[in-house]
Amino acid sequence: MSNAGGTAGAARGTSRRTVGILCAIGASLAWGFGSTTSDYVLSAGVGNDTFLVIELSIGFLVLLALGAIRGELSGFRHPGLLRASSTGIIEPWGAYTLGNVGIIFSSGAFVALVSSLNPVLIAILAAPYLGERVSRRAAILMVVSIIGVALVVGGAGAAGTLKPEGIIFAILGLFCGAAYVLISSKLVRTMPVLPLVASQLLVAALASLALLIVRVTIFNGELQLPATEMQWAVSVATGVFGGAAPFILYLEATRRIPTTTVSQFSTLVPVIALIGGVVFLNDVTTPVQLLGTAIVVVSLSLLARYARAH
């Protein structure tokens, strides 16, 4: 009986880790696809703050509907949720806004490269904050995957002008992203994921709306709404893939496998964005980018295998 019980326990542990890995991969897929749709909408001339209001509001409404279907609305009365929802200022609002401003002063490739350092920052801070340590093998795979990302985002050649402001905003966005992951990973140990993420999206949407109102009323800016049905459809889709889905999946993953491991799968995001650009935006890849893609995929495959066993 003891052997049978031990075997069953090991199987449950493996299954739990497998689900965590799948959630981490799913979050990266959603963020990558969301990057592609965001690129399409913003390139069409939709205002950044306007787009964030639409995207984050849709994400909130989707999670609210999902919570109603799953009977989880009672979770919105969880003690401490109101205070915890303020982390939405850090991300999505802070990280997304700072990243977009960073792109204005530098380039999307540079901001993506800086963002790929997120697993490194989390690995450093997770030890004192979450009590997690990265194994030697996982650390090696993390470095290899980041090298792959560097090839993916830099393989098309340098683009844009790198200014000090771009560096500052990109780094601030990086710290916002890492802070959100560490704080939220700890929060979901004691509160339900769906109400937490929905509340964070709502706070971020309201912050974006406040900026939009200031820009339009005080600085006489234009609303810059989506101009066509396609732009509206893609904006709404981004609310699902860039707002609701990735945060839910990411935090669900941290409940099953170490946060330091989950963060490493985020290096898959630029790869998915690259593929999405080729498929939907007619972007052209280079051999260097394809090599980087292969490196990221192989390193993350090895990481998934290692995480499933440990």
Protein language model features and the residues they cover:
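Glycine-/small-residue-enriched transmembrane alpha-helix faces in small-molecule transporters
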Residues: 1-54, 159-186, 206-211
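Juxtamembrane helix-entry segments on the extracytoplasmic side of multipass membrane proteins
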Residues: 16-21, 44-53, 76-81, 154-176, ...
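Helix-helix packing/entry segments at the starts of transmembrane helices
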Residues: 28, 53-54, 96, 111-119, ...
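Specific transmembrane alpha-helical segments of multi-pass solute transporters/efflux pumps
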Residues: 30, 34-35, 64-115, 151, ...
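Hydrophobic/small/kink-forming positions within alpha-helical transmembrane segments
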Residues: 32, 36, 88-93, 97, ...
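Hydrophobic/aromatic residues within transmembrane alpha-helices
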Residues: 41, 51, 55, 102, ...
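Specific alpha-helical transmembrane segments that line the substrate/conduction pathway
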Residues: 50-61, 90-91, 99-133, 138-142, ...
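Hydrophobic transmembrane alpha-helices of multi-pass small-molecule transport proteins
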Residues: 63, 125, 134-156, 208, ...
